């Protein structure tokens, strides 16, 4: 008598999926749509826990080739990875002036992507769409894209004799739990005095996060003996934001230019390198005609070379507008060396003008992402 054999053992092959989300804003986009340049490239971005796999977005405002000249083309490009290729899928959409998603395009199934192989849409959106810019651009002529990428990580197999019910692994709450320590004075062992305000904290956390605090509590200093630290020349609200970062790794108010500048100074003072990078990134993104000169001063003061380069590049592009601002006038009086650097950069750019064709010149001067 024949019959089906019963499986006495089993095996499961599983794959882990990692996701990232990247937002890219291009200023003065209608300018690019009207021109016949080749493409604009975003900054490099990566997964939070895998900086060896890097990506960028590339937009062709007048189409990737002649047959697509009536469209804006958009591609995701894998720049580097530890292996020869990755399996990924992605979707991208436009964020309009109201922050609403529109014109969503997606590649729904996982595809093998090779480094530097364009992966995307040759007909992402028609150029005619920009004849009614309110549909796709903000009032200040910014074009914002939101890109979501899913990457299939290595698969692994699990074997077993008898099926067992799956165990649901709960989300790790460490970040929130440590954040609660900052909100709750229970078990604190030191005081931080800032302009008449007292903040309670934990020496172990301060020492683990900041080399400056560690030195205070390690050596025979007054702070170690009294468990009290007096903080001078720091606004209480800025200090509170810095402490929130120390406990949670988050900074919710970096959208404010003044807060980002003050936090950059505090991060430099207390050796918080990750916070410095976050502030530098926020200040790069918020560069404007009004704050460019002040941003250059801040970047120079705290030796943030990337921010300084971005500020100088911005001033070169908008030299006539920036030179009329109160910030520039103030910098002429207080930091003549930086004014000289800006003029030197501008002179170098003008030399490029005579050495390059007009189209190539424009791309060498104008930032692709502000």
Swiss-Prot record:
PROSITE patterns: BTB, MATH. Residues 188-251 form the BTB domain. Coiled coil: none annotated. Residues 19-149 form the MATH domain. InterPro entries: BTB/POZ_dom, MATH/TRAF_dom, SKP1/BTB/POZ_sf, TRAF-like. GO terms for biological process: protein catabolic process. Belongs to the Tdpoz family. This is TD and POZ domain-containing protein 4.
């Amino acid at each position: 008598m024949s019959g089906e054999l019963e499986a006495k053992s089993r095996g499961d092959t599983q794959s882990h999926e990692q996701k990232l989300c990247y937002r890219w804003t291009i200023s003065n986009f209608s300018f690019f749509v009207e021109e016949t340049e080749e493409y604009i490239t975003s900054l490099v971005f990566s997964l939070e826990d895998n900086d060896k796999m890097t990506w960028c977005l590339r937009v062709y405002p007048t189409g990737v080739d002649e047959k697509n000249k009536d469209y804006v083309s958009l591609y995701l490009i894998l720049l580097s990875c530890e292996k020869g290729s990755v399996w990924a899928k992605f979707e991208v959409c436009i964020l309009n002036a109201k922050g609403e998603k529109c014109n969503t395009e997606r590649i729904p199934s996982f595809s093998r992507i090779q480094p530097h192989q364009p992966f995307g849409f040759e007909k992402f959106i028609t150029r005619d769409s920009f004849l009614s810019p309110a549909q796709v651009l903000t009032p200040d002529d910014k074009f914002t894209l939101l890109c979501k990428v899913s990457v299939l990580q290595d698969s692994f197999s699990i074997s077993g004799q008898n099926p067992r019910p799956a165990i649901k692994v709960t989300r790790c709450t460490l970040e929130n739990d440590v954040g609660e320590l900052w909100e709750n004075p229970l078990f604190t062992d030191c005081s931080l005095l800032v302009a008449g305000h007292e903040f309670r904290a934990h020496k172990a956390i301060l020492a683990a996060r900041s080399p400056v605090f560690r030195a205070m509590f390690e050596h025979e200093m007054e702070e170690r003996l009294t468990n009290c630290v007096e903080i001078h020349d720091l606004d209480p609200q800025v200090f509170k934001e810095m402490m929130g970062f120390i406990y949670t790794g988050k900074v919710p108010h970096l959208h404010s230019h003044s807060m980002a500048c003050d936090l950059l100074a505090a991060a430099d003072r207390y050796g918080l390198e990750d916070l410095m990078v976050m502030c530098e990134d926020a200040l790069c993104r918020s560069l404007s005609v009004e704050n460019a000169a002040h941003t250059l001063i801040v970047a120079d003061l705290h030796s943030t070379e990337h921010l300084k380069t971005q500020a100088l590049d911005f001033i070169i592009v908008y030299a006539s507008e920036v030179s009329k601002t109160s910030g520039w006038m103030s910098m002429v009086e207080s930091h003549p060396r930086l004014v000289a650097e800006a003029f030197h950069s501008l002179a170098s750019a003008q030399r490029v003008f005579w050495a390059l064709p007009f189209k190539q010149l424009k791309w060498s001067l104008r930032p692709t992402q502000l």
